[in-house]
Amino acid sequence: MSDSKYTIIFDELDDQFRNEDIYKSNIISLIKVTERINSLFYKKNVKCKIILLLRLDIFYVLNDPDLNKIEEDSSVKIDWGKNDDKNSPLFDMIILKLRQSMDPKIEKKLSNQDILEQLFPESLHTSKGRCISSPKYILGRTYLRPRDVVTYLNHIKDISPDKEYFSKEAIKSAERKYSSYLFKEIKNELCGHLSNEEIDESFKLLKQFKKVSFYYAEIEEYYMKRTNLFPHINLHRMLELFFNFGVLGNQWTVKKNGKSRSYYSFSHRENVDIDFDKKFNVHLGLRKELNLY
C-alpha cells in the first residue's frame, strides 16, 4: 500500500450563493457527508482527508442540529488577526514572499525590519494630513486578508514596474484601481444576502450621500426624501448588512485630559455588533470607488 497522503479540497462553494433552501440544503449535505467520510477514513487508517472551504457568513446562515458539533470538532477558522501595522502576520507573509525573490546571499543578511525599510516608505500622509506608517496605510484599506494585500501590492508594481521598491506615489496612485477591486469583491460577497437591485441601490445611496462619516438620523433623512430613487432598499437592513460585511464601521470620540481621540470598530477586525447610536464610517478601501473623500 502507498505511504502517500492525499488531500481533496473543495473551494469556491460560495460562487453564485443564494440564500435559498435548495442551496443551503446542498451545502449542509456536503458538509455532513464530508464529516462522515473523513471519520471513516480515520477509522480505516486511510491517509486521505477532504477539506471544504466556505465563508463564515455563509456557514452561519445554515441551520442544522449537527452543524454546531461539526464546527466545534472539525473546523478551522482562518484568521489573520486584528493587527493592521507592521506586526501583522500579513506583512510577515509579504516579507517572506519578497525574500523568495531576492538573492539568497543578500536575503540571509537582512532582518524583516531591514526589508521593510528598504522596500516601503517609512510613512504616508492621509487625505486629512495624518502621518501613518506604510503598513498601516496599506492594511487599513484591506479586510485583513492575504488576497487583498497581494492585489494592492500587484497594482503598485503595475504602476511602477521598473522600481525595486514601493514608492509613496505608487502606493497612492494604485489606490483607485485597488478600490475598484475591493468594491467588486464585496458586491460578490453580498450576493445572496441582498438582491442585485438592493446591492446596486445601497451603494448608489452611499455614493450620492457623499459622506464618509455620518449618523443614522442623517442618512435616514436623506433617504426618506428620495425613496423613489431607492425603491428596493430597507435602510435599517441595508446598514446592518453593510456593517456585518465591513462596508461600514462604527466611529466614536472619547475626550480625556482635554484631548479628543476617535475610535473605530469594524466587523472584520472585532466581534462587534452594529450600534445605531454611534457614527457610521465608510471603509477606507471603498472610498475611492465611491468617490468619497
Model feature map: region roles:
Residues 2-7, 12-127:
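The catalytic "switch" region of P-loop NTPases
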Residues 122-293:
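C-terminal leucine-rich, beta-strand-based interaction scaffolds used for sensing/assembly
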